[in-house]
Amino acid sequence: MSTRRAERAFEKGLQSIARGDFLAALGFFEASMALLPANGGTHAVAAMSYYGLCLACATDRLPEARDLCEAAVEAVPEDPDLYLNLGRVCERQEDREHAFRTYVRGLRLNPRHPGLVEALRRLGFRRRSVVGFLPRDHAVNRVLGSLRAALQRRPRRRTRRPKAA
């Protein structure tokens, strides 16, 4: 019975996050964690991660929020949503480098995770310049960078191999 109530509280917390109401979500995730046993598996760990995210977004308790999210990632390292939550907390702490690395680790698990892809796009990291010893705004780097981007946007052609007789 309490497991079902914990799941309902968890779902309401996710809905509150979707609305941007992190303070309400904080209460739902706290209730979910209280109703689940300490060894409640991945559901309890996810509740802890989302609680950390809400703590970072609704209050100024950023170190505690980051500790919770990092503990969740350590407990269940195969869940990309936990990496997204940790990355968002790192962004709130203005630690863009750690947020970037966290998003990339999450994308290794699921390369098409929409939240992680959007977070990386929003973060806006640049690629390395093509010719490293020249300044980024050097004409050679600008031309080669444009060429590299155009080649990567272009769909690849599949070459036909002759059928063996």
What kind of feature is each model-predicted range?
Residues L68-G106:
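A generic tandem-repeat structural signature
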Residues F10, H43-Y50, D81-N85, R101, ...:
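Alpha-solenoid helical repeat scaffolds
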Residues M1-T3, R8, Q15-G20, P63-E64, ...:
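Intrinsically disordered, low-complexity, charge-biased linker/tail regions
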Residues A9, S16, L55-A56, C90:
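Hydrophobic side-chain positions on well-ordered alpha-helices
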Residues G40, A56-D60, E94, R121, ...:
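Short coil/turn linking the two alpha-helices of tandem helical-hairpin repeats
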Residues L14, L53-C54, R88, R122:
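Residue-level recognition of tetratricopeptide repeat
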Residues A18, L23, E30-D81:
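Alpha-helical adaptor scaffolds
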